[in-house]
Amino acid sequence: TERSLVYETDPIRRTRAELAVIDCAYGADPRSAEVLRFDFLTRMAALLAAGKPVLLPVPKYGRGLEQLALLCRARPKAAVFGDAQFLYQLAWAQTDRFWLAPNARDSLTRVQVQPLTGIPDSGVCFLSDPQLKSPGTRKFADAFIAAGGSVVMTGTPERGSYSASLMQDGKMEYLRYPVHQNETEYRRLLRENHFSRPIPYHTPDFSAKREILF
């Protein structure tokens, strides 16, 4: 999405192309990025107010830093923990800031994230394995749940994944965090450019002819 809170983006405007493959992963979901972020913060506030820790399984790179920046801005006193990969990602962002949006550079430099070495009494915990594919992260998530903590999925669970099974069992909550476009944003991008043949990508809600002939 062009509306990242952390990453620098180059908006596509007045561009001509014969073929444009455009992200539309959220399809018919009408909620804007602003609404999704508000819903995310509202629910996270309620979970943290309960006095138990919250586990956020996130990709090795990407939305984790966005969620960190948003949560630290909204709840600056909340303790934050991250596994080794998350700390590596944060250290990279703090030193190589070329990819960061100007308003995120200072906030990510000042933020304090403690190593996630166990299950804390409270706070936000980032775990760099969204589908919980490794035995270690599965074991950690199970122990987290057994200790009374909340586990929140913010991306799309893969079919057959451990995260999907936790959601089916009611042990993992789902809060979509915006990193892709919906159909409204996809159509807006079309209006602001000149694409002869646009193809909406990554959505089951509607389709377009996908055969490409040269």
Which role does the model predict for each range below?
Residues 1-64, 69-79:
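His/Asp/Glu-rich metal-coordinating catalytic cores
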Residues 1-6, 105-113, 134:
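Short gly/ser/thr-rich secondary-structure transition/capping motifs
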Residues 5-8, 30-31, 88-94, 161-164, ...:
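Short, charged, surface-exposed secondary-structure boundary motifs
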Residues 11-15, 36-37, 70-75, 95-98, ...:
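Short, solvent-exposed amphipathic alpha-helical segments in soluble enzyme
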Residues 21, 77-88, 151-155, 199-202:
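Short internal beta-strands
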Residues 65-70, 90, 136, 207-209:
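Phosphate- and divalent-cation-binding pockets in alpha/beta enzyme and binding domains
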Residues 70-129:
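Accessory terminal helices/loops
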Residues 110-214:
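C-terminal regulatory/interaction regions
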